[in-house]
């Protein structure tokens, strides 16, 4: 279930609908887009500009492949940076705690 949204070189969106996907909004848009494409083919001067939408950005929106491509890489980088930050915070906390304990221990030795 899903559909592929494509962005062509003019910045216009077009999409290929998956036959297993049943979204009336997308079907209505697909129908209107097909009608616009047919109207463009009827007018030669418009057809020269919009004859074929050659996609250079493909965004695949499916239920199965949520973690694919660039999104997956960005999620991995985000988790990696989060882990580094947490590790640094924990290290600083442990260092400060040990330093405090050592200082308290030395102060108690000096008082005796």
Curated annotation (Swiss-Prot):
Q: Which GO terms describe its cellular component?
A: host cell membrane; membrane; virion component
Keywords from the named record: Glycoprotein, Host membrane, Membrane, Transmembrane, Transmembrane helix, Virion
Q: Which residues are glycosylated?
A: 29, 60
List the membrane topology term(s): Single-pass membrane protein
Is Methyltransferase a UniProt keyword of this protein?
no
Q: Which domain of life is it from?
A: Viruses
Regions crossing the membrane: 66-86
Localisation: Host membrane; Virion
UniProt keyword Protease present: no
Question: Which family is this protein grouped under?
Answer: Belongs to the asfivirus B117L family.
What name has this protein been given in UniProt? Uncharacterized protein B117L
Q: Which organism is it from?
A: African swine fever virus (isolate Warthog/Namibia/Wart80/1980)
Higher taxonomy: Viruses, Varidnaviria, Bamfordvirae, Nucleocytoviricota, Pokkesviricetes
């Amino acid at each position: 279930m899903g559909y592929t949204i494509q962005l062509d070189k003019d910045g216009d969106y077009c999409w290929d609908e998956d036959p297993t996907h049943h979204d009336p909004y997308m079907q209505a848009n697909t129908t209107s887009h097909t009608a616009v494409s047919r109207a463009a083919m009827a007018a030669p001067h418009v057809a020269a500009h919009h004859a074929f939408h050659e996609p250079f950005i493909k965004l695949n929106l499916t239920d199965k492949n949520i973690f694919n491509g660039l999104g997956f890489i960005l999620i991995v980088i985000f988790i990696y940076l989060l882990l580094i930050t947490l590790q640094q915070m924990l290290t600083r906390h442990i260092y400060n705690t040990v330093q405090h304990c050592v200082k308290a221990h030395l102060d108690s030795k000096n008082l005796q």
